[in-house]
Structure formats: C-alpha cells, structure tokens
UniProtKB/Swiss-Prot annotation:
One of its GO terms (cellular component) is extracellular space. The gene is Nrg4. Glycans are attached at N39, N60. CDD domains: EGF_CA (cd00054). Residues 84-115 are cytoplasmic. The keyword Repeat does not apply. Proteolytic cleavage close to the plasma membrane on the external face leads to the release of the soluble growth factor form. Extensive glycosylation precedes the proteolytic cleavage. Keywords: Cell membrane, Disulfide bond, EGF-like domain, Glycoprotein, Growth factor, Membrane, Secreted, Transmembrane, Transmembrane helix. It comes from the Eukaryota. It comes from Mus musculus. This is Pro-neuregulin-4, membrane-bound isoform. GO terms for biological process: ERBB4-ERBB4 signaling pathway.
Length: 115
C-alpha cells in the first residue's frame, strides 16, 4: 500500500517492476522502487526469495521424527536379540555344568561301589 509520499508509477515506469511487483515513485526521489509480491525480492523484484533453511519446515521435522523412530526401534530390536542370544548361551553353559556335575556324581558313586 502506498504511503502519503508514494505515488504509483506513470506509464514511463509501468514495466519497471518484475514478477508482479508494484511500481511506486516518491516525488523527491528520481528513480522508482518496487513493492514485491510474496516470494520475490530485490530492487525490481527480480530475485526469488527462498525461505531460510535454518528454520526447519514441518515436513523436515516429520522426516526427522520418522528416522529417529526407526533408529530407536532397530536399536531396541538389536538389544533384545543380543540379550536373548546371550541368555541362550548362558543357559547352555549352565546345562553343561549340570551335566558335568551329574557325570562326576555318577562316577563318584560308581567308584564308591567298586571299593
């Protein structure tokens, strides 16, 4: 919107602004200037304005959340697998120890009977 000092450009400067920008002049300044529409910037609205990548968009946050959830799930699954694998190995070694004890006890009983 023009202020009190701004006036729309005359026919001489109608095509001065690009990409839908609106041309204005200030009587005390010889050159025109532009009010750019959304997503354009520059003296003549010639540059596309890209939003800063430092502000994460909603889709970026969603993607980051999905990646984090997948990584967390994989980590938990790996820990469960390792715990089960370790538990099975411990159970096998306990059974082996029990077998050895039973075998030793059986031998001891047999050797006592032989004497």
């Amino acid at each position: 919107m023009p202020t009190d000092h701004e006036q729309p450009c005359g026919p001489r400067h109608r095509s001065f602004c690009l990409n839908g920008g609106i041309c204005y002049v200030i009587p005390t300044i010889p050159s025109p200037f532009c009010r750019c529409i959304e997503n354009y910037t520059g003296a003549r609205c010639e540059e596309v304005f890209l939003p800063s990548s430092s502000i994460p968009s909603e889709s970026n946050l969603s993607a980051a959340f999905v990646v984090l959830a997948v990584l967390l799930t994989l980590t938990i699954a790996a820990l469960c697998f390792l715990c089960r694998k370790g538990h099975l190995q411990r159970a096998s070694s306990v059974q082996c120890e029990i077998s050895l004890v039973e075998t030793n006890n059986t031998r001891t009983r047999h050797s006592h009977r032989e004497h």
